[in-house]
Structures are given as structure tokens and as C-alpha cells.
């Protein structure tokens, strides 16, 4: 999968906001809130091919977290990204 074009990640206090901008995005008024971990993952894979395993490995490599916990967290994150329509399956 890939992140969709037309989104800009912006810091807002301790959170991050993914803002829809540009012609590629149908609803430019949408904003998606992310915590710092989700924002880190977004920045690491933005514009690149990735899968759940890529995100799991990034979590394990950067935080002291078990593979099982990372897999559960990535599952929740990907569901939210897909629901928000900010990623596309290639």
C-alpha cells in the first residue's frame, strides 16, 4: 500500500494533524489527528510502498515493544488510515 498524495502532516501541540490539500484529495476540508507514534510511522512510509510488516518493524526498531503488541497496534492504525481514506492498496 501507499499513502495517498495530497496530505500534509503538521504538528499541533503534542499531536499531529494530517491535512488534506491539493487536487488529489476529494474533500480538502478533512483533517486527521495523529499521536507522535502514528505521525512517525506516516513520515517513514510517506510516498513509499509499505505493508503492515514494515510498520511493525519500524515500531520494534524504535521502541521497546513486543512483536505481538506492535502487530495489534499496526492493525488498529491501518484500519483507521483506511477508514479515513489516506492510504491506497496497490
Where are these regions (language model features)?
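Long, charge-rich, low-complexity alpha-helical segments
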Residues: 30-90
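Acidic, low-complexity/disordered tracts enriched in E/D and polar residues
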Residues: 1-43, 90
Amino acid at each position: 500500500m501507499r499513502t495517498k498524495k495530497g496530505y500534509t502532516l503538521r504538528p499541533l501541540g503534542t499531536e499531529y494533524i494530517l491535512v488534506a490539500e491539493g487536487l488529489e484529495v476529494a474533500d480538502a476540508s478533512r483533517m486527521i489527528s495523529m499521536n507522535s507514534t502514528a505521525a512517525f510511522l506516516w513520515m517513514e512510509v510517506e510516498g513509499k510502498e509499505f505493508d503492515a510488516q514494515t510498520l511493525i518493524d519500524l515500531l520494534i526498531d524504535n521502541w521497546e515493544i513486543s512483536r505481538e503488541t506492535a502487530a495489534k497496534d499496526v492493525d488498529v492504525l491501518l484500519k483507521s488510515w483506511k477508514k479515513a481514506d489516506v492510504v491506497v492498496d496497490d
